[in-house]
Amino acid sequence: MIIVAIDENNFKKASELINKLDPKKCMVKIGSVAFNSIGHEIIYYAADQGFKIFLDLKLHDIPNTVKKSIQGLASLPIKMLTIHTSGGKDMMMAAMAVSYTHLRAHETDRY
């Protein structure tokens, strides 16, 4: 699967790029540039166009903060999410536990 980065902080430019893509041939990556400026709006826009979303935030903090961050992102229509492994084993285990719970709860959703 080809992953296309949407590294725009302007919704119009980001949506124009998305409109040039085919959701059957690629998925889109929303990183910190886009997420910090137009995050939820561009994620929902891309999902509405049929794209799978890769949210590339490289979460890195204490285990409980990463866990709560993932819980906060759980309502978004994302397929993949990155964490930064230098956060350590406990952080990665907390992320995995909450992610697994989220995936099990949404097995029938469009993920």
Regions found by a protein language model. Give the residues of each.
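C-terminal helical cap(s) of enzyme catalytic domains, especially alpha/beta-barrels
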Residues: 95-96
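Conserved N-terminal beta1-alpha1 strand-loop-helix module at the mouth
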Residues: 1-55, 59-89
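Conserved small/polar residues in nucleotide/adenosyl-binding loops
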Residues: 101-108
